[in-house]
């Protein structure tokens, strides 16, 4: 029996993964607003205590996915908490009277997709849901700038001389695992690079995985629902061919640890001059090697909150929705960096900007 026939009648689920700041949430927001009449159930796994991505999507006003259809798993990597968090959450979603037509799962930028995909073979889930496909979103501008290539070349060259350098950096492993798991790769932010840069990105991404999934280009996360949904792969049946670094380490008796990354929340008052704040924030991010920053700001005299999303020195900002009646106004930012980031120094530097 073919995979497509075996999965008839099951709810399709699309796993959307990608490195920090690749544009997953923006792409999902666009998808929800153009869902072709499908009712979408959304599970969001965020890294950090403040559920920024979930709040952004809840505020998008899409009829395809109401607030009740959005479930957040915060402050825990879904790849490490499948049994405790994901499976009970999925079961609860399936028990609803008004079940979704399609389920979208957004992993955190730190999640390994493979354990999540394997969870769809859990008996209670396998009989009800199939993985329609895994979509990996790539920050084309970051890859074009050599963010991963430099680390790979250095480690690969030194590994021959030093047995202690047998494993590549955790960031690079995440990138490669997300590519290896993909059925569709979205090269996002292609408007930020030229034709030669795009070719280099395609070559780089292709070299990172032995599998050759389809690659498409996008800007601002704009990809049609007809492209993202309905792949019909049944990825859970092919998980053995998508082995991650994580699984290979476990086979060798090693453990996976997300302590390479830290996150914390900075809470501030109002931002009187957001343009000046953003400009100075770029300096703080560059000085302290902050990987990702995201959150909201309160601007006096503005009825809407200002959404702030930073990947490296590149910062996007826009007013996303009005403050709710009785909602406490303020500025809340999630900062994500490597484990040796000086939290006290970063917190003090950001606080000093106000």
From Swiss-Prot:
Domain CobW C-terminal: 261-354
One GO MF term: ATP binding
InterPro entries, per the entry: CobW, CobW-likC_sf, CobW-like_C, CobW/HypB/UreG_nucleotide-bd, P-loop_NTPase, Zinc-reg_GTPase_activator
KW Iron-sulfur (keyword) present: no
Enzyme class, spelled out: hydrolase
Keyword vocabulary terms for this entry: ATP-binding, Chaperone, Hydrolase, Nucleotide-binding
Binding-site list for GTP: 18-25, 80-84, 188-191
Full protein name: Zinc chaperone CobW
Record organism: Sinorhizobium sp
Lineage of origin: Bacteria, Pseudomonadati, Pseudomonadota, Alphaproteobacteria, Hyphomicrobiales
């Amino acid at each position: 029996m073919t995979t497509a026939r075996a999965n008839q009648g099951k709810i399709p689920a699309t796993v959307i993964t990608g490195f920090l700041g690749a544009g997953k949430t923006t792409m999902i927001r666009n998808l929800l607003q153009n869902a072709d009449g499908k009712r979408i159930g959304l599970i969001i796994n965020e890294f950090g205590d403040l559920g920024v991505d979930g709040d952004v999507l809840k505020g998008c006003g899409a009829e395809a996915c109401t607030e009740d259809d959005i479930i957040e798993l915060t402050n825990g990597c879904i790849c490490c908490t499948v049994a405790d968090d994901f499976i009970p959450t999925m079961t609860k979603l399936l028990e609803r009277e008004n079940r979704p037509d399609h389920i979208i799962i957004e992993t955190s930028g730190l999640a390994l997709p493979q354990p999540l995909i394997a969870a769809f073979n859990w008996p209670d889930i396998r009989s009800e849901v199939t993985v329609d496909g895994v979509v990996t979103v790539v920050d084309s501008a970051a890859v074009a700038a050599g963010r991963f290539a430099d680390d790979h070349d250095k480690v690969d060259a030194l590994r021959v001389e030093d047995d202690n350098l047998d494993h590549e950096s955790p960031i690079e492993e995440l990138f490669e695992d997300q590519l290896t798991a993909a059925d569709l790769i979205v090269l996002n932010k292609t408007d930020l690079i030229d034709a030669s840069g795009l070719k280099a990105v395609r070559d780089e991404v292709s070299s990172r995985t032995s599998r050759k999934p389809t690659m498409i280009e996008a800007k601002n996360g704009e990809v049609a629902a007809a492209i993202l949904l309905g792949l019909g792969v049944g990825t859970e049946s092919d998980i053995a061919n998508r082995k991650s670094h994580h699984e290979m380490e476990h086979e060798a008796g090693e453990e996976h640890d997300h302590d390479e990354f830290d996150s914390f929340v900075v809470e501030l008052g109002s931002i009187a001059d957001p343009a000046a704040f953003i400009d100075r924030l770029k300096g703080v991010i560059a000085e302290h090697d902050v990987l990702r920053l995201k959150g909201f700001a309160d601007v006096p005299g503005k009825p809407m909150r200002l959404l702030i999303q930073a990947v490296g020195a590149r910062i996007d900002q826009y007013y996303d929705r009005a403050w709710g009646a009785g909602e406490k106004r303020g500025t809340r930012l999630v900062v994500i960096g490597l484990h040796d980031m000086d939290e006290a120094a970063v917190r003090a530097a950001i606080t000093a900007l106000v």
